[in-house]
């Protein structure tokens, strides 16, 4: 289209604090980063962003003048697809990171979490995220369980299935082994890109299965921490939709 456009949800959530709540650029917060006129124009997700240009038509085969809607980001779209279209509906997205979106009637004031007007008209949301989830399990696969990966590559079972073996024989708490999952900084509630992962309580009795279970537990504790903060605001959570590759894990770590 030749137009630089972002939907309100993504603009206010991912580019905070560069925009005011009405979608106009904030000159003060833009100052150290860019000029306000360099920011994308904020529109609603179902607005028309523009129309297919001649150049785009030649590259894509789409007819010149075809309207193109603004759309939204992957997590917002997936939340709607799962059913987050009313207050009390919540999505937990299990991918490289974990992202949670809870529909609410009103905006919640809590600096620990993200909150904005949602894509669905008249609906607000609280959102939160854990930076290392699937990326943490992948790190364990590649670094701590390379034999499981090699077995898979030679026609054996999926490496993650091999890694889950015997985890259910380890008690909750991984025999005192605790992980902080901040291997890639952390989003909410600490919002600190410099946070780092920690594994403490190691003894000679611990195995790599203990380490992996502790990592899975740490992600579960992180999700629980976010949920507890949300519930501090007396917002209902009536239904939770779980999506993403993390749903394929067949052993619960807690």
Map each language-model feature to its residues.
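Catalytic phosphate/nucleotide-handling subdomain of diverse soluble enzymes
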Residues: 76-138, 142-143, 147, 232-252
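Beta-strand segments within the central parallel beta-sheet cores of soluble alpha/beta enzyme folds
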Residues: 36-45, 67-70, 91-94, 152-157, ...
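Amphipathic, well-packed alpha-helical segments that form the structural scaffold of globular domains
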Residues: 53-57, 141, 145, 200, ...
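Gly/Ser/Thr-rich active-site cleft segment
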Residues: 1-73, 181-184, 212, 216
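A short helix-loop
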Residues: 1-2, 26-37, 57-58, 103-188
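Glycine/charged-rich beta-loop-alpha catalytic/anionic-binding loops adjacent to active sites
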Residues: 56-66, 116-122, 202-208
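Acidic-glycine-rich active-site phosphate/pyrophosphate-binding loop
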Residues: 46-59, 105-115, 190-199, 248-252
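Activation-segment/catalytic-loop signature of the eukaryotic protein kinase fold
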Residues: 176-252
């Amino acid at each position: 289209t030749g137009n630089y456009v972002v939907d309100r949800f993504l603009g206010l959530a991912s580019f905070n604090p560069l925009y005011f709540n009405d979608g106009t650029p904030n000159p003060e917060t833009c100052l150290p980063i860019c000029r306000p006129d360099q920011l994308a124009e904020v529109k609603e997700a179902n607005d028309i962003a523009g129309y297919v240009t001649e150049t785009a038509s030649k590259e894509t085969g789409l007819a010149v003048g075809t309207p193109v809607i603004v759309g939204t980001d992957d997590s917002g779209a997936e939340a709607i697809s799962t059913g987050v279209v009313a207050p009390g509906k919540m999505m937990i997205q299990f991918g490289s990171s974990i992202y949670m979106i809870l529909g609410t009637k009103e905006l919640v004031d809590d600096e620990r979490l993200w909150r904005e007007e949602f894509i669905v008209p008249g609906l607000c949301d609280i959102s939160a995220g854990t930076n290392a989830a699937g990326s943490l399990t992948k790190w364990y696969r590649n670094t701590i369980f390379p034999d499981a990966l090699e077995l898979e590559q030679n026609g054996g079972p999926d490496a993650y299935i091999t890694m889950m073996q015997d985890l259910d024989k380890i008690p909750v708490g991984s025999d005192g082994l605790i992980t902080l999952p901040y291997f890639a900084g952390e989003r909410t509630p600490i919002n600190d890109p410099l946070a780092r992962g920690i594994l403490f309580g190691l003894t000679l009795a611990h195995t790599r299965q203990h380490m992996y279970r502790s990592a899975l537990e740490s992600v579960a504790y992180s999700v629980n921490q976010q949920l507890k903060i949300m519930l501090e605001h007396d917002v209902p959570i009536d239904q939770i939709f779980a999506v993403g590759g993390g749903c394929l894990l067949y052993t619960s770590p807690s």
